[in-house]
């Protein structure tokens, strides 16, 4: 363990051996940061006891925390990573996110401000592969380069860094809030905290689109809806209203994305129009998840989402 106090902790969660290749590249992107001596990397390992260690985890800036394979969800693993972290700010990256040059330095600098959470620009690491470009627009269009610098209502999930003491105040609620980070961000803002986009914080995100990807969209969206309703104290009537309105989600979100691109990113409109069928299909999976999550709660969605990330359920593209 490094003797000096780190300025930034980065939590990455790893699962079964077949899912580790992308995370090894994620870890490498952190170990090649200019400010690596200021970083602590917390690898939360949720694989079986006989699984080989993540390549690169023997680096002096890396600390491994073992959790049981059985019964540990992605959100629980991330929350434990936050608790184990030693730096005042803690960020997350997953197996399809990679830090670009200067990422850590920019986060440390930005967090000198009054921000509870800081996010940055997201680049598409699988551009022109299959339907990755329309999915990129759907998920990260507002953080595409050049991302506007300034206070924000929402930051990119899985690529955001928080002040540790702020999110630890949520105690036993933290795992639930980390199931779907937009819920955590909404809760932070309701509690008077502020979020910030710094375009100097640059990361690459990979996108895979295949039938199993729809499973991940469904599972994450059900987690989002259930966590949103429960954490924000929604009444049964409000949950039913949102749940019964969920079939409108694909059209409403596609229309909002079209309007945003028309006004802010018109160069992306051809990609949107070509990819509209896959966007609607992905949002249909999300609509099913949100509708069920609002009305019936979490169900097995958190376990299913964990399987897509840690147990090899979702097929992954090869990233550069």
Which role fits each region the language model picked out?
Residues 90:
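Short aromatic/hydrophobic "clamp" motif used to bind/position activated sugar donors
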